[in-house]
Every structure is written in C-alpha cells, then in structure tokens.
C-alpha cells in the first residue's frame, strides 16, 4: 500500500466558516452556491492511495472491451430511481469493469489519444459518469445515503493492511475523549494556552511516532476545552490557531519526508485525528443549537456548515479509517441533520427544499469525481 501526501489546510473550523460566510448572502441560492464551493474547494486532507489495477474480467481485444463497456452504458440508461444500495453496487461493478477495459486498451499497439480505442473509451467513460450522476439524482437522497455510498464505494474497501493499521491506532484515539477539560481562566485563557501549545509544537517539530502521538493527545486536550466556548468565539479572530495548526501538520508531513515517521503512520493518524475533530465539531454544533447557546444569525450560518462539514470534506481514506464508534456517531449526525437544518431554515429564512437537496448535490460531486 503506497501513500502520497499533498498540500492540505489546517482546521480551526469556526474561523474558516466565518471567513467563508463573510461575503455570503443568507438567501437560499447563495447558500447552495456556497455549499457547492466548499464541497469542491475546502478540504482538510487530500490523501490518495494507488490502485493495483486488477480486475475480474479479461478481454481478448480492445474491440471486445469497448463492446462490453458500451453494453454497460446501455444498461445504465435503462435504470431509473435506483436505491442507494443499487447505486453503490453499480458503481463498484463499473470500477471493476473500468479497470479491466482500461488495462486491455492500454496494451493496444496504436496509441493515438483521440482515435479508436482510446477516444471511444474516454467518450464512454464520460457518458457513464453522466448516467451515474443521473442515477444519484433520480431520488431524494439523505446524508445517511451519502455516507453509505461513500463507505461502500471507497477505493480502500478490502484493504487489509490499512484496516490492521487502523485497528492498532483505535485504542489511542478512543482514549482521547476521556481527557479532562481544562478551562481555568475562561475563554481567553483557554485560547491563549491553545495558541502557545501550537506555537511551541510548530517550533519543536515532530521527530518520530512518539512525538506525533504526544502532539495529537495534547492538542486534543486544548481543542476539547476550546469547544466548550465555541459559540463565544463567533466574533473573535482565531486565525492564529488555524495558521499554527497548519504549521504543525506540515511538520508531521516533513517528518515523514525525512523518514523520522512512516508516510503510512502520518496519513492514517492525521486522517483519524481530523475525523475525530470533525465529528466533535458537528456534535458540539448540534448540542449548542439544541441548548439555545447560539443566538445570532451569523453564528447559525457557521453552525449549519459545521454540521455538514464531515460530509463535505472527508475523502476515501478518511471514511475508510473511521472506527466503528465514529462511524455510528457520524450516522447519528446524518440522521439528526434534517431536523436541525429544518429549524435553522426557519430562523434564517432559507428555502427548506434547497437545503434538503444538499445531500444530492454532494453525492453528484462525489460521483463526478470517481
């Protein structure tokens, strides 16, 4: 299993949401456009793993492969209003077929990008993507459906090496929620301690797995205290937290580049760390909204996006490293979102139907990128 690192942003999520929302209008069209932009551009991690390229079909010629691919497209065009289970199954079948077809035509002796069979393959591939998107949009979808599709069609499904590494890391992350909350001195003291810790960690760097675990553990201690004051930070500039968090994460990747830390550990632990934070952010947002702690519309907009953020930003690796508990928690958030969004729609005068269509838009973006 090979891991590659790409540039990613840190996460002081409320600040990011505030910056995004600064120029956003509170009408429904603005909300939808904003969410699409976030789903396509705002990413905490961009993590990729290489496919082995193996399929289950074998073709004797490019002609045979293209005919099979065309037949698959024809069958898709006859499908309508499919269940999410059927859509997931179809996507997985297409991936196997696509690997086989692309592998077969890559052996073709005539390699002309815009001619047969390569040009035909690309045209069919584009048409299949269009049909899969149509199928995704053929019925009303929920956040539960979106998570199910992401889970079932992840490119890491069946990766035993990854699952073993995740299993070994789970006890460490499970222990984080038992850490005490240290909020002595109020919100400004909490913010100051958090920032000092990040600055110190960025300066010292990460020099091995032991340093990585120590950083994640202590960071979560300050982050957990920070969440207690989340609504109170709505009007505060916490850009220093975001920038120093990014710096610390870059130090982890530099440690992997120096081979002080394996790329596998860097990617898995960073993904699991981010999952943990996204979940706790969304849970805190729901709790704060239900307790009446969120009063102003500006913060409500931010909280709306915070609740949806896990479904916008998690990539294949992030979904694949979710523990059973975190996965169950994420499904609970998915099931709670319709009610929470309905309540916010009334308070913020948003179009409820357009908000309810958000999972479909996110699903379309996901399928388009397959």
Give, region by region, the residue ranges found by the protein language model.
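Short Gly/Ser/Thr- and charged-rich N-terminal loops/segments
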Residues: 8-11
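C-terminal motif of bacterial Sec signal peptides marking the signal peptidase cleavage site
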Residues: 46-49
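Immediate post-signal-peptide N-terminus of mature secreted/exported proteins
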Residues: 53-92, 151, 158-194, 203, ...
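Coil residues (strongly favoring Ser/Thr
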Residues: 86, 99-100, 108-109, 127, ...
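Long, low-complexity or tandemly repetitive, helically biased scaffold regions used
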Residues: 106-134, 141-154, 186, 225-236, ...
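Intrinsically disordered, low-complexity segments enriched in Gly and acidic/Ser/Thr residues
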Residues: 274-334
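A cross-kingdom marker for long, charged
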Residues: 332-370
């Amino acid at each position: 299993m090979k891991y590659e690192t790409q540039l990613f942003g840190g996460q002081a999520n409320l600040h990011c949401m505030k910056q995004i929302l600064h120029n956003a209008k509170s009408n429904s069209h603005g909300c939808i456009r904003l969410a699409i932009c976030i789903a396509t551009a705002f990413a905490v991690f961009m993590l990729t793993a290489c496919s082995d390229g193996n399929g289950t079909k074998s073709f004797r010629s490019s002609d045979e492969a293209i005919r099979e691919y065309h037949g698959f497209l024809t069958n898709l065009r006859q499908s309508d209003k499919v269940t999410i289970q059927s859509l997931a199954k179809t996507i997985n079948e297409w991936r196997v077929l696509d690997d086989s077809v692309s592998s077969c035509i890559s052996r073709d002796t005539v390699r002309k990008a815009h001619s047969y069979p390569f040009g035909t393959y690309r045209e069919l591939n584009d048409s299949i993507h269009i049909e899969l998107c149509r199928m995704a949009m053929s019925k009303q979808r929920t956040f539960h459906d979106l998570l199910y599709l992401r889970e079932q069609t992840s490119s890491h499904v069946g990766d035993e090496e990854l699952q073993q590494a995740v299993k070994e890391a789970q006890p460490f992350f499970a222990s984080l929620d038992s850490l005490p909350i240290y909020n002595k001195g109020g919100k400004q003291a909490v913010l100051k301690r958090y920032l000092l810790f990040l600055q110190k960690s960025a300066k010292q760097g990460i020099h091995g797995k032991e340093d990585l675990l120590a950083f994640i553990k202590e960071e979560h201690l300050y982050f957990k205290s920070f969440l207690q004051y989340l609504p109170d930070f709505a009007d505060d500039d916490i850009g220093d937290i975001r920038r120093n968090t990014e710096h610390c994460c870059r130090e982890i990747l530099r440690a992997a580049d120096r081979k002080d830390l394996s790329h596998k550990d860097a990617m898995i632990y960073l993904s699991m760390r981010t999952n943990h934070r996204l979940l706790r952010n969304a849970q805190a947002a729901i709790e704060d909204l239900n307790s009446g702690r969120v009063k102003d519309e500006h913060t409500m907009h931010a909280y709306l996006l915070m609740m949806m953020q896990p479904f916008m930003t998690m990539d294949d690796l992030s979904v694949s490293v979710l523990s059973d508990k975190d996965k169950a928690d994420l499904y609970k958030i998915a099931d709670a979102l319709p009610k929470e969004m309905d309540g916010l729609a009334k308070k913020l005068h948003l179009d409820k139907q357009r908000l309810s269509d958000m999972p479909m838009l996110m699903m379309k973006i996901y399928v388009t990128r397959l």
